[in-house]
Regions:
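Non-catalytic N-terminal targeting/anchoring module and adjacent flexible stem/linker
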Residues: 7, 22-23
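Bacterial N-terminal signal peptides
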Residues: 9-17
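Hydrophobic transmembrane signal anchors and adjacent membrane-proximal interface regions, especially
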Residues: 2, 15, 245-246
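Glycan-recognition and catalytic cores of secretory/periplasmic carbohydrate-active enzymes
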Residues: 23-378
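Bacterial N-terminal signal peptides that target proteins for export
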Residues: 1-8
Length: 378
């Protein structure tokens, strides 16, 4: 189950914090700035650089939307969904939900809090951040580590799964972007050393297939840290994570998944879409870019919908008028397109992003952000 706060904060906060052009100096295709870090060699230089969270303050319509989110479910999910997001949550040290749902909420709430500079929201976010930092063990592992018996409405098993940690990594990356808290750098360095040692024996797909199919989310944070520290082991880890991740490049170039119903999970496709481009920064093989461009064409002819998304009620469906598309698919595809635009500078991805943002997304939430529709029909 994906959650409204993560969905909306991620997609709307994108408008005020996403990648923007930095100073264009010697090479018009490369963003160079003394204030913000581009990719460190040997990673491919990016034409756009993401500004820190909070460096741009919303006004007008955008501010109104974010305030509505604050007053809606995004800012109040700990009350609306207290069983999962309350003090029993495993990411607060409790005996309740230990998987993705808590991190997903904070993935949206944290940027919303710091973009609005809203102390009440920041106070809600900080216990999750502080518990996560304090949970790290000497070997680098972090997060819940105890599986418990089933309880209706809660996910209390697979506590050591790699996937929910990928969501929390994104939370911690955003926290650093907003605050500059240097504890985050040591936290990630220790965790990535743990991953490098642990993944050969316990790969991304050991506990669930989600980590294997969404490994690109892990990979992008590894590169982010490498650009800050320059630690060479991170490049080795990048290769290992890519190798263990579902081979989206081959899926897009050589296989027929996009012409078969039920072949993939619809949100995994949206999240996996960026992985070839994220990895392209390290291996710089043009086939990674060719793969995602081919995928766009294939989707248009089979499972695609006019919104730019695809049919999928969990699993892929052909793009027929009666076929639904998940709200989760919309925002995860938007995030993938943001990353792809930042890395390549190709305005094709900006156009695609706009198409999804203004056609798919608005139909699936109420104006006051108090409710959302899981599936939409075109």
């Amino acid at each position: 189950m994906k959650l409204l706060p993560k969905i909306l904060a991620l997609s709307l906060a994108m408008v005020v914090t996403t990648s923007v052009a930095a100073n264009q100096l010697a090479n018009e295709k490369t963003a160079i700035s003394v204030n913000y870090k581009n990719n460190r060699y040997p990673l491919l230089q990016k034409p756009y650089i993401e500004l820190p969270i909070g460096s741009i303050r919303p006004t007008g319509w955008m501010q109104e939307q974010l305030v509505r989110m604050k007053n809606g479910m995004t800012g109040n999910l700990d009350q609306v969904y207290e069983k999962v997001m309350g003090p029993r949550n495993g990411w607060l040290g409790g005996d309740g939900d230990v998987w993705e749902r808590g991190p997903y909420w904070i993935d949206g709430l944290l940027p919303l809090a710091y973009i609005l500079n809203d102390q009440a929201l920041i106070d809600k976010v900080k216990p999750w951040v502080e518990w996560t930092l304090a949970s790290q063990k000497p070997n680098g592992y972090f997060g819940p580590d105890t599986d418990r018996s089933y309880e209706p409405g809660l996910q209390r098993d697979n506590s050591r799964d790699w996937w929910p940690k990928m969501v929390m990594m994104k939370v911690m990356q955003q926290y650093y972007s907003a605050t500059g808290d240097t504890r985050v750098i040591d936290f990630f360095t220790r965790y990535f050393k743990y991953q490098l040692a642990e993944l050969p024996q316990n790969p991304l797909g050991k506990w669930t297939f989600w980590g294997e199919q969404r490994g690109g989310d892990n990979l992008m944070v590894v590169y982010w840290l490498y650009n800050i520290t320059g630690d060479k082991f991170l490049l080795d880890l990048g290769e290992l994570i890519h190798k263990q991740t579902f081979n989206w490049t081959d899926i897009f170039l050589n296989q027929d998944h996009l012409s078969r119903q039920l072949s993939l999970h619809c949100v995994n496709l949206a999240q996996g879409f960026k992985e070839p481009v994220v990895y392209y920064q390290q291996n710089q093989d043009p086939k990674q870019i060719c793969a995602v461009k081919k995928a766009v064409k294939d989707i248009h002819n089979t499972i695609g919908l006019p919104t730019g998304l695809w049919g999928g009620d969990e699993l892929l469906r052909f793009g027929e008028p009666t076929t639904g598309s998940e709200l989760c698919t919309a925002v995860e595809m938007m995030f993938s397109l943001e990353e792809m635009l930042e890395i390549t500078g190709d305005v094709q991805w900006a156009d695609y992003l706009e198409r999804v943002a203004y056609n798919a997304l608005p139909t699936q939430v109420t104006d006051d952000y108090s409710a959302r529709q899981y599936y939409q029909q075109t």
